[in-house]
Amino acid sequence: MREIVHIQAGQCGNQIGAKFWEVISDEHGIDPTGSYHGDSDLQLERINVYYNEAAGNKYVPRAILVDLEPGTMDSVRSGPFGQIFRPDNFVFGQSGAGNNWAKGHYTEGAELVDSVLDVVRKESESCDCLQGFQLTHSLGGGTGSGMGTLLISKIREEYPDRIMNTFSVMPSPKVSDTVVEPYNATLSVHQLVENTDETYSIDNEALYDICFRTLKLTTPTYGDLNHLVSATMSGVTTCLRFPGQLNADLRKLAVNMVPFPRLHFFMPGFAPLTSRGSQQYRALTVPELTQQMFDSKNMMAACDPRHGRYLTVAAIFRGRMSMKEVDEQMLNVQNKNSSYFVEWIPNNVKTAVCDIPPRGLKMSATFIGNSTAIQELFKRISEQFTAMFRRKAFLHWYTGEGMDEMEFTEAESNMNDLVSEYQQYQDATADEQGEFEEEEGEDEA
């Protein structure tokens, strides 16, 4: 079967990753000891996409946990599903990267990377037909961003024809942990543009807004944010884990979603997002899911899709529902909002349907959009980067680890190129008649 090797790097990556394993273990009926207690054969049918079967019918996540300090991994180990992971797959250093990309990428991380690659090889060799890798990390810190991107490029060298998929938490202005986030993020994006096939851009600011506005949580914790991320990750990977009427794997997804190799940064979304209290007051229908899923308030990246146009979209519906209705609704969205989809890619919305809904819901939908509006996110990081870099603020932390200023300049211009590529395709029309229609569409919106 088509296996995926999961890697989580750094504090953020490990926390999101741990939550992801809790959610999908629950969906597959696997308890914290790795034993199966499910009630449906469908749960086991494609279990080996994410799990290895060990002696005594134990299922072990095909996960590799990486960090440059032991702290976060200790808390994962003592967390609810800590005992399910294979002990050899915890790879950690002692020194920490101190939110410094250079330490993660060139010094501390580079020392640890070989032992991580050994574990990656071990996991890949036990696969029947390896489909690809997924990495969870953040771009603002040191380990997830610096060492995460180092791992990506090393894995890319060794497995050039496998899909590389990342869930990357972008730094956001409202939720900032460190001053040097713009540096770390820009240096990381420089790597991601070249070395990944699909990157889901997740943004703490957007997650906060969802928790606050939609879920009515007055003081959202990181646990709440990570819960949203794991719901999305679970949705994105549904097709790979359960049989469905229209299945996708990582490669099919990439083929459908990436029109130009550099433009592979997706905005994920999820529906239904309802606060815990008001769940039973809403009937979930396919039209409602579709409408909610395309709503900018449901996007996990702090960009407004109405400010750009969709190059491609993938929607994954879960639950028992009529295929005909799903198709009608998706067409309906495209027809009503045609100005927001580029007209030079016909049929640019793909739908997949899986029969098994997530726990506690009758049906749900996960949205993956490749929208030119994502440039807002890169512009934001780029502005912050430029402000600091112009004064060479904090640069000594990076040059002290052996980095060169040239590398910063290159990363900056690569990011700006990315922004202008998105802009160029946003403005492109199949013929010049398109501009008039676009203005009309804006009046309605």
UniProtKB/Swiss-Prot annotation:
The modification 5-glutamyl polyglutamate is found at E438. One of its GO terms (biological process) is microtubule cytoskeleton organization. Residues 422-445 are annotated as: Disordered. One of its GO terms (cellular component) is mitotic spindle. A motif (MREI motif) lies at residues 1-4. The keyword Transcription does not apply. There is a cross-link at K58, K324 (Glycyl lysine isopeptide (Lys-Gly) (interchain with G-Cter in ubiquitin)). Keywords: Acetylation, Cytoplasm, Cytoskeleton, Disease variant, GTP-binding, Isopeptide bond, Magnesium, Metal-binding, Methylation, Microtubule, Nucleotide-binding, Phosphoprotein, Ubl conjugation. The modification Phosphothreonine is found at T285, T290. GTP binds at Q11, E69, S138, G142, T143, G144, N204, N226. Disulfide bonds: none annotated. High expression in brain, where it represents 30% of all beta-tubulins. Some glutamate residues at the C-terminus are polyglutamylated, resulting in polyglutamate chains on the gamma-carboxyl group. Polyglutamylation plays a key role in microtubule severing by spastin (SPAST). SPAST preferentially recognizes and acts on microtubules decorated with short polyglutamate tails: severing activity by SPAST increases as the number of glutamates per tubulin rises from one to eight, but decreases beyond this glutamylation threshold. Glutamylation is also involved in cilia motility. Some glutamate residues at the C-terminus are monoglycylated but not polyglycylated due to the absence of functional TTLL10 in human. Monoglycylation is mainly limited to tubulin incorporated into cilia and flagella axonemes, which is required for their stability and maintenance. Flagella glycylation controls sperm motility. Both polyglutamylation and monoglycylation can coexist on the same protein on adjacent residues, and lowering glycylation levels increases polyglutamylation, and reciprocally. The modification Phosphoserine is found at S40, S172. Tubulin is the major constituent of microtubules, a cylinder consisting of laterally associated linear protofilaments composed of alpha- and beta-tubulin heterodimers. Microtubules grow by the addition of GTP-tubulin dimers to the microtubule end, where a stabilizing cap forms. Below the cap, tubulin dimers are in GDP-bound state, owing to GTPase activity of alpha-tubulin. It is linked to Cortical dysplasia, complex, with other brain malformations 5: A disorder of aberrant neuronal migration and disturbed axonal guidance. Clinical features include seizures, global developmental delay, and various brain malformations such as a diffuse simplified gyral pattern with reduced volume of white matter, globular basal ganglia, thin and dysmorphic corpus callosum, mild brainstem hypoplasia with a flat pons, mild cerebellar vermis hypoplasia, and mildly enlarged posterior fossa. This is Tubulin beta-2A chain. It comes from Homo sapiens (Human).
